[in-house]
Amino acid sequence: MHAERNVKQVVRWCLYIVLGFPLLNSCKDDYIYDNEEPSWLGANIYEYLESSGQFDCYLALVNDLGYKETLRLTGSKTMFPANDEAFSRYFLSKGLTGDGPTLIHNMSASEKRYLFNSSMLNMTYLSHMLANVSSNDQGIGEGIALRRATSASYLDSISFVKPAALPKTAFWNRFRERKGAYLADNGSKMVLYWTPEFFSTSGLTEADWAVIMKGETDKPYDTQGFYVNDAHVESNRKDVTCKNGYLHIADDVVAPAPNMSEVINSTAEMNTFAGLMEKFAYPYYDGSVDDAVKAYYGAGSIEDSVFVKRYFNQTDFSSDPDEKVDIMGYGTLAFDPSNNVYGGNTDMGVMFVPSDAAMEDYWESSRGQFLRDSYGDWDEVPTNVISVFLQNHQRLSFLTSLPHNWDIMTDNAGFEMSVKEEDVQKAYIACNGIVYMTDKVYPPVDYQAVYGPVLTADTTTTMSAAIKNDDMDDVNNLKYHLYLRSMDNQYNLLVPTDDAMANYRDPITWALWANEGVDKREIWSFYVKMGKVVADVYDTNEDGSKGALLRTVGADALDTEGAEEVANRLQDILEMHIVVADNEDEPLSGFIDEGTLPYVLTKGGSVLAVSGTGEQVKVQGGGDREMGLPEAEVVTLEKDNRKARYEMDNGRTFFIDRILQDPFKSVYYTMSANEDYRAFFDLLVGNDDVFLSLADNEDYKDIEPIFETSE
């Protein structure tokens, strides 16, 4: 039995083999590429470049970096090589001539790595895929990518900056003492890919491209090829397929583009703007960067700490983790122009940078007069003042700032910037945005409006705080800057100086004295404390001069009633010192210094008497005339003996030497004391007996008093 069972098992296995053989044979796939390569598949990347005979410089980079075998083997690379002619132009732009490969060999190892890696992506991308991004939530986002990270690393761009090239602020003094500083880039630089797919998705037009490329030649808007930074890849030189990746052959060397900070600092025509921008540069210590650099270059190669040059900005550096700098008090940029990855794959920034000539023209013009009067020189403008100016020249998003949108583009406060294509002298492509050098300045609305001079002068600090209080949540914030920043109206803004604001005749107590003989007159002396206006209240001497101090109003944070009193008085003052200049329906509306109106109507409904023209204009309120006080005059500046009168975009500003005040005497008491008005006064007063006799008469039951006194 045992032998018989073994025979049956052998027979069964033989049958399995016989039956299974045809099945195994049927699994044979006749796929033709098992034994041969596709005809469209080229050589490996290295062989392709070598066989062409036009890429000796690029291959010198490859060989010097030991990358030959990598580019011969299978892998997944996308490369943007340039031929030897392009490298000759590249070296010539740097003042170098000679044999291309020799010039490559003479470069430092880090320079070679930085240049080579900037032309390589560690994935395979056909040209139409360069604008795609992947999203965990939405899958593939097609056509929305503008930039990509390359194989290049900030570790190959460490620089030692000598004292002369360091920012001039105190933040960098310690490095001047050390004879310089080691600085790392703020992130690894990305490369821009201007593809037809991105053009279509973003709406970037041919006219837009002409502005972006202003100053360049032979850079046409291309819907078939594409650009890498500003290097052109023509349609017949893209998507070269090799065994281990794709080549897109550029007309120029694909080198790491500078960031916006580097563009501005290296362009001679932008020196003035660059100097202001550098006031916000800060040596930021990042331990992980310092460790990475020293590990990369080896122990002892760099003994000092390595810092990152960053800029105070509202996007990612508005507070100091070490609490050494009050950044918001110091002032910030809108975003960091040195941040190489700002905007990510799909967006970046824009900066409109006025040329030195444009900055000088603005400074010397009537629009910049108030800054010149306050500070004398661009470099003397405080950082918290100039930061607002610089922010207005930054745009957070390239996509929302395409040239075809400039006619509707608004600044950070929502006002039209009024940038025109003809304003642009030249455009620069940076790794993190576009820098447009312009022949115009675009000041913020605060520096265009009539209250602009008030904000910067050291003699109008009280009125400055009254007009624009940065604490928008303060219930007593009058917010008059929102009214005065309207560019659709024209204003006269009369601004009492700080000295004038120290002598305000309180209208309530002075009215009691003028009308009823109750002498409890007070003089209020306004000043700024902790950013808010407060007042010292003084008794009044018999001759109307300031007497003893009675109390201080609004200084205590718990003194809410006092704060309300101060706000009430300030509102009266502001209403009295604003005259609308272009109200066609008001005969007493116009510019006070043109000599056409002897009287003008204020915003609050008071009437001012006006005399003189231009800088010699004089103004008087009814209360001033009533008290026999002289007219208010435009003050003379100490610096250049010039009158403090300013032409602004929405009107004229006058610094005056006294507060204008309404009459203290009421109409009733004025008319009752003047015999010339007696008959009319008696008519107005009427006869109470008439109303008493008619009160019970049914024939006159519909007669009601015009004025009623509430109980």
Please place each PLM-identified region on the residue numbering.
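Mature, structured domains of secreted/extracytosolic soluble proteins
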Residues: 26-711
